[in-house]
Amino acid sequence: MASKTSAQIPDEPTVVPSGLLKELTPDQLVRSRDNPRHLFDREPLDELKKNIREHGVLVPITVFQPKGQRKYYILDGERRHRCCEELQAEGHTVRLPANVVEPPTKIAGLLYMFVIHNFREPWELMPTALALDVVMKDLSVNDNKAINRLTGLSEPQIERCKIILTFPEKFQKLSLDVDSKTRIPSNFWIEAYPVLNLCEDELTGLAKKYGRDGLTEKLVDKYRARKIRSVIHFRRIMEAYKVAETKEDQKAVLDKLSEYILDVDLETRKAFD
């Protein structure tokens, strides 16, 4: 994991309001390709859609109009827009109140959304981590205090995101599955991280044979086989190793961990209770 290195806090790109409040129809709006939310689960969308059908859009969305274009691009409010599109397709007349801002840079728009969602419904952890990665690379910042000031994320949240970003993209994508039933929860990577480190440090033969990615895939397979009932059960492995008082006890835990990794049907609690 990347360490906390001191860094000068960069100047914060900002979103500049234009002072305009408009009412727009769904077809006047374009969704931003840079929206870091990624996940739009059906159940909360249905709840929001029902509320909009009954009361209209109560909270204005935030949009900007690129120079020379007629349509407005959504900076904040894609969920409301999606619901209004569906309602319009069902025959309802829907308009969205919209605060118009000056066209922002990509990074300014992203930081704006970070701040908005810190005070409202937070993003899922994986989209947050991927958005944070853009911020860190674009602004060349890795210091947690600087990131906190820019995004409003707490330092523990930032550390969790940095752990997620150590996993290859192919694993990150598993937490962006549009189907919540088959999606690997973002916390899976947080809880698996120390277990994988333990494997690399103490089960060197196993780690050399399969590689870190191979070990990760085995844990994913075990989760999909429902042999990891809760991702926090990974903590039992680390607790068992930490409380082992003798080398013989540690070896017994490591032998069980090796068996656990290789046997997809061995459930976590059964192995480490």
Q: Residues of each region from the PLM?
A:
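Short hydrophobic/aromatic-rich motifs at helix boundaries and adjacent loops
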Residues: 19-23, 52-56, 101-105, 116-117, ...
